[in-house]
């Protein structure tokens, strides 16, 4: 959501968020958006810019614009789903997606971000943020993680165990994989099981032009969780949208469809289909107001697009605490 107390250029979409009863806002890629605080927001390298600094000192952290951004999410009525890590980097030079120099120190930094947000540390807040996600798409072709899979397995283990020992009451999970890739996922789950790594939720992504692909992947990911003993772990699809191709005319058609009535119908269809699967949460990508994949809000004016309405209707059903049956 966008909100500012400036005297000018102060358009907001908070009323639309409230009306749609959107339950969660995920913070991933928020640092790509100037209106959210840009390169001073959410990501570990933005909040803790000098990795050689003291992670136990409040002076090492810059929470200012992240706090403002999370305040706006609270104003919208949504709860925060916080991604610990860094935004995607499509550039030829990378800045925040390399393996941290010290995995344990990185976990301690994450700990103090949570303490600031939930326990008031460093002039902080008591936001009660429950979901804390470790990284994003570590399996995605050096755009989110430049290290090896084995290095990521170590980072995930160290961070999950440390955070769970500090905060047993919150939910720790991840790693927001970009797709169902058994060659990456099976070694990940084998290591997590062998090392007894706690995982309260498991997050994953799916982009497709076919509703049945979302059903298929939901079942595949759930089967992996159950196979490796994570039977009580939540399965969360927290990036999804209509995509029929990632380049050329396919990508052009994808973006056009996301803004169309067909894109809106697709949102409703996927949400409805997944309602009948063993899936705990869906998070549409993207409501970021400068994103070309945003089928909900127009850039600049922040007026709603067609894709907003199925989410609004879903929010109404969420308030009724039950699925609505239609008789034809």
Language-model segments: which ranges?
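Substrate-binding cleft and catalytic face of glycoside hydrolase catalytic domains
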Residues: 20-211
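Aromatic/acidic polysaccharide-binding cleft in carbohydrate-active enzymes
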Residues: 241-328
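Short alpha-helical segments and helix-capping/turn motifs at coil-helix boundaries
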Residues: 5-14, 64-68, 116-119, 187, ...
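Active-site mouth loops of central-metabolism enzymes
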Residues: 1-8, 98-100, 253-256
């Amino acid at each position: 959501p966008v909100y500012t107390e400036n005297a000018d250029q102060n358009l907001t979409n908070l009323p639309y968020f409230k009306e749609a009863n959107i339950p969660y806002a995920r913070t991933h890629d928020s640092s790509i958006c100037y209106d959210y605080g840009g390169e001073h927001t959410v990501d570990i390298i933005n909040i803790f810019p000098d990795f050689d600094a003291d992670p136990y000192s409040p002076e090492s952290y810059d929470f200012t614009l992240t706090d403002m951004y999370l305040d706006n999410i609270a104003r919208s009525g949504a709860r925060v789903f916080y991604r610990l890590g860094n935004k995607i980097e499509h550039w030829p030079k990378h800045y925040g997606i390399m393996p941290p120099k010290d995995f344990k120190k990185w976990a301690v930094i994450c700990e103090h971000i949570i303490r600031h947000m939930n326990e008031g540390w460093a002039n902080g807040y008591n936001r009660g943020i429950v979901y804390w996600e470790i990284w994003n798409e570590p399996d995605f072709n050096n755009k989110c993680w430049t290290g090896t899979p084995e290095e990521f397995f170590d980072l995930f283990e160290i961070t999950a165990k440390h955070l769970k020992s500090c905060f047993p009451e919150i939910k720790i999970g991840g790693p927001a994989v970009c797709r169902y890739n058994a060659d990456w996922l099976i070694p990940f789950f084998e290591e997590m099981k062998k090392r007894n790594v706690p995982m309260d939720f498991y997050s994953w992504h799916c982009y497709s032009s076919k509703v049945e692909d979302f059903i298929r992947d939901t079942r595949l990911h759930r089967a992996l969780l159950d196979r490796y003993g994570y039977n009580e772990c939540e399965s969360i699809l927290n990036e999804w949208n209509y995509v029929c191709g990632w380049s050329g005319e396919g990508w052009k058609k994808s973006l056009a469809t996301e803004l169309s009535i067909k894109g809106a119908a697709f949102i409703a269809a996927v949400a409805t289909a997944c309602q009948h699967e063993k899936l705990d949460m869906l998070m549409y990508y993207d409501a970021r107001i400068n994103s070309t994949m945003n089928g909900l809000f127009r850039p600049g004016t922040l007026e709603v697009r067609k894709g907003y309405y199925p989410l609004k209707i879903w929010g109404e059903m969420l308030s009724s605490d039950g699925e609505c049956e239609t008789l034809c």
